[in-house]
């Protein structure tokens, strides 16, 4: 089995994982604003109904009712302004999702035998740093019986992953020393490297790994 590793550098911040994103903050803020708007609308309806009942009483003066009416009109304007602001935030969220859909950059994130998907975002997003592309080419023979055997099968596939911490994965004087462990779905194969060669080509480092598995 041969593996060709391609190491590339991307633009962007150094963080691949953020604990609190701007989109989550805006979504939470919009939810709180919608809740406040609903409470304000309910209070406005309750106050309006109460004022209409007081209007029928003889002891309630017109000036007091007019003052309450002005207050309710101000509250109604505030509720309408809140609705407009919420609508603009929802429109912005829709545009943000569409931008992320068409401008996304997906890759596999490998950490602690867990493969995750990362997608770039418009705000608080992370481009890929020190991306490692691994092209595996596997040639093997499966013997069916002692008289018959399968033809040599060649399998080629490419995985683009980001390695967070690999202690033994080092490049010293353009040589690869150590080992690389690839694990997916609790099944792994160890790739032991020795006398590896590196060729420089357009900011790309090609490393050939030889394995005895």
Swiss-Prot record:
One Pfam family recorded for the sequence: NAD-GH
The protein, known as: Putative uncharacterized protein YDL228C
Organism: Saccharomyces cerevisiae (strain ATCC 204508 / S288c) (Baker's yeast)
Note: Partially overlaps SSB1.
Record InterPro entries: Glutamate_DH_NAD-spec
Source taxon at top rank: Eukaryota
């Amino acid at each position: 089995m041969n593996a060709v590793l391609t190491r590339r550098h991307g633009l962007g911040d150094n963080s691949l994982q953020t604990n609190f994103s701007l989109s989550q903050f805006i979504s939470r803020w919009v939810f709180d604003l919608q809740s406040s708007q609903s409470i304000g609308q309910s209070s406005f309806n309750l106050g309006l109904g109460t004022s209409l009942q007081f209007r029928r009483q003889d002891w309630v003066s017109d000036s007091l009712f007019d003052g309450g009416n002005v207050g309710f009109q101000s509250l109604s304007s505030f509720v309408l302004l809140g609705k407009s602001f919420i609508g603009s935030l929802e429109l912005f969220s829709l545009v943000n999702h569409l931008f992320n859909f068409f401008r996304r950059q997906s890759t596999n994130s490998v950490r602690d035998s867990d493969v995750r998907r990362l997608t770039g975002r418009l705000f608080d997003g992370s481009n890929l740093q020190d991306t490692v592309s691994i092209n595996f080419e596997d040639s093997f023979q499966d013997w069916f019986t002692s008289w018959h055997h399968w033809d040599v099968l060649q399998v080629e596939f490419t995985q683009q992953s980001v390695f967070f911490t690999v202690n033994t994965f080092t490049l010293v004087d353009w040589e690869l020393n150590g080992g690389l462990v690839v694990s997916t779905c609790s099944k792994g194969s160890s790739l032991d490297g020795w006398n590896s060669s590196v060729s420089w080509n357009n900011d790309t480092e090609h490393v050939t790994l030889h394995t005895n598995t």
